[in-house]
From Swiss-Prot:
Belongs to the Fmt family. Its EC number is 2.1.2.9. It catalyses: L-methionyl-tRNA(fMet) + (6R)-10-formyltetrahydrofolate = N-formyl-L-methionyl-tRNA(fMet) + (6S)-5,6,7,8-tetrahydrofolate + H(+). The gene is fmt. It comes from Bacillus mycoides (strain KBAB4) (Bacillus weihenstephanensis). Keywords: Protein biosynthesis, Transferase. It is an enzyme of class 2 (transferase). This is Methionyl-tRNA formyltransferase. The keyword Protein biosynthesis applies. HAMAP family: Formyl_trans.
Length: 314
């Protein structure tokens, strides 16, 4: 039986690991990030992949830095025929990449060469794409730059969020891997080099990228809100207080107003001017230190005036 090592960390990776087990491969080890403190109480919490591996009695390796010799040698000691990675979260060294008979392959959540990096799902929505997908490719030391083995497209719906697309792509990745591994073993795949001219990047989201830029078009603001839902969540400021914006709707506005200005108060939300004639009606938000709520709930306690400017001192 072929021995496989799986490397992954978040929820996205779990269906991929599960599919390898269901397909009957001998998963001899799982490599995942170390347990981390989570929440206000800083409770030391295992990764979703570690939890899944332990359910199946699979040995778990948790390197702080996989590139260090004493760490990668633990992986080599498992003598895998194939290594599969999916959102592992560290650059894997050549010593590991060159060891398995069938190589090291990665399940990546974009149609490479577009959106290399750690946040391809966020960026696909933030950039207003109508489709994205899964790429399975050989791993190299350079970020997401290996030769492509297989791809599948996934449609992005008008009201898609990063959360819903994350789930769709995770399942699509597991399904594509199930079809790819047998073809790889049989030598039936022709690897395709990525076009460097078409490369774009989706680096991990930084705090300053979470701020809503109201000078952008209404469509761009709407995509920004969707792309950061449910994490890390877009935000703006109202009367100097941070407000997380969980959801908004695109609406046509006729009023001429500076971007970021509240131009209408409605029962289910307030309409904010943007950089074009498409405004955004905020319908779900979370004031600083409070729970997520509908905008209608918020408006029962707080009534901002028309003409109030959002995003000042953000």
């Amino acid at each position: 039986m072929m021995k496989v090592v799986f490397m992954g960390t978040p929820d996205f990776s779990v269906p991929v690991l599960r599919r390898l087990i269901e397909d009957g491969y001998d998963v001899v080890g799982v490599v995942t990030q170390p347990d981390r403190p989570v929440g206000r109480k800083k409770v030391l919490t295992p990764t979703p992949v570690k939890v899944e591996a332990e359910k199946h009695g699979i040995p778990v390796v948790q390197p702080l830095k996989i590139r260090e010799k004493d760490e990668y040698e633990k992986v080599l000691a498992l003598e895998p025929d194939l290594i599969v990675t999916a959102a592992f979260g560290q650059i894997v060294p050549n010593e590991i990449l060159e060891a398995p008979k069938y190589g090291c392959i990665n399940v990546h959540a974009s149609l490479l060469p577009e959106l290399r990096g750690g946040a391809p799902i966020h960026y696909a929505i933030m950039e207003g794409k109508e489709k994205t997908g899964i790429t399975i490719m050989y791993m190299v030391e350079k970020l997401d730059a290996g030769d492509i083995l297989t791809q599948v497209e996934v449609e992005i719906e008008e009201r898609e969020t990063t959360g819903s697309l994350f789930d769709k792509l995770s399942e699509a990745g597991a399904h594509l891997l199930s079809k790819t591994v047998p073809l790889l073993i049989q030598g039936k795949l022709e690897p395709i080099k990525q076009s460097e001219a078409e490369v774009t990047f989706a680096y991990n989201i930084k705090r300053e990228q979470e701020i809503i830029d109201w000078t952008k078009t209404g469509e761009e603001v709407y995509n920004h809100i969707r792309g950061l839902n449910p994490w890390p969540v877009a935000y703006t400021t109202l009367a100097g207080q941070v407000i997380k914006v969980w959801w908004g709707e695109k609406v046509s506005i006729t009023e001429k107003a500076e971007p970021g200005t509240i131009v209408a108060l409605e029962e289910d939300g307030f309409v904010v001017a943007t950089g074009n004639e498409t405004g955004v009606k905020i319908t779900e938000l979370q004031p600083s230190g409070k729970k997520r709520m509908s905008c209608s709930q918020f408006l029962r306690g707080t009534k901002p005036e028309i003409g109030t400017k959002l995003g000042e001192n953000a």
